[in-house]
Each structure stands twice: as structure tokens, then as C-alpha cells.
Swiss-Prot record:
Its EC number is 7.-.-.-. The chain crosses the membrane at residues 9-29. It comes from Escherichia coli O157:H7. Its main location: membrane. This is Ion-translocating oxidoreductase complex subunit G. Disulfide bonds: none annotated.
Amino acid sequence: MLKTIRKHGITLALFAAGSTGLTAAINQMTKTTIAEQASLQQKALFDQVLPAERYNNALAQSCYLVTAPELGKGEHRVYIAKQDDKPVAAVLEATAPDGYSGAIQLLVGADFNGTVLGTRVTEHHETPGLGDKIELRLSDWITHFAGKKISGADDAHWAVKKDGGNFDQFTGATITPRAVVNAVKRAGLYAQTLPEQLSQLPACGE
């Protein structure tokens, strides 16, 4: 009887150990898969705001943290694109704080000479059917920033048409596009200051 109990006890212990090991392995595989998927999604988003042929470094690994009013409150990530180890452009996280329904989060690609290379909205709470046209799936409006140059802080072209600029507003919704245009302009101007700052910026994860 005692031998039987011991035998069952050992069997249960081995089963428990095996189950624990299997669970740990599955969890690790799941974490790896999620991380890989997130990395692919991030790369796809980068490619929408910065043409892949413009750089040849691992963009996600060239990440810096900045605290700059031009990008909005708090810390924002900035990714430096390099061609043969020379900084040539950046992808910047930016916040438009003055959307109709709150802050609008953006990703802006820009070179260091004042040209915006692409822009995408990553998060917003704008009104469906009105301000949400800043989303690429609903309108191509957000693509109209690509290739546009900013000629200084006083460049009047960088405004919605209602304010005398070059960018369309939406029917019944001017606040949202105005907020995005202004935020992209600020980010593009800030990008021009990055080369001289790089040696002083903390890397992401430090």
C-alpha cells in the first residue's frame, strides 16, 4: 500500500514538473510570437512614413527619448534613420493636444532639411463621420503631407485652407485637421534640430 502511494506520488510530481515546464515553454513561445508580430507591425508603420530605401540601419534599434514642447507633453520616442551610419531622417512620435475630442497621437517621418516624408495617426478619439477622416482607412487626407517642405515657423502654407493654408479641412470639422496640420508642422521643424542633439539624447530603454 505504502509503495503504491509513493509510486503515485512520484508520478504526480513528475507530471506536475512536466506540466510546469510545458506551460513555461508555451508562454515563452507566445511572448516571442507576440514580440515578433509587434515588430512587424511597427516596421510596416515606419514604412508608411519613411521610405525604406532612404535608410539601411535597424530603425527600431535607433530609438531615443526626447522631451520637447514641439512634440507635445511628456516623453516621445524618436527613431533616427541612417544611411551608411550617417543620420539622414527621423520618425517622430508627436501629439496634437488640441483635437476636437482630445489629444491625437501621430507618427511623423521627416528629413533634416524641413521636408515631411509621411504622417500617420496612431490614436485618436475624434467624432465618427467627421474628424475621423484623419484615419487612412477612411480617407487619403493624411497622405497629403508627404513631400511637403516647411520653410520655417512662419510658413503660412502649413495651415488648413480656411486659415489661408494649403491643406483641406473636412466638411463640418475644421478643428481636427487644423490640430493635425499644426502638430505635423511642429514635428517637422523639430526634426531639423535633431542632428545636433543626438549625442546628448538618452536611448530608449536606458
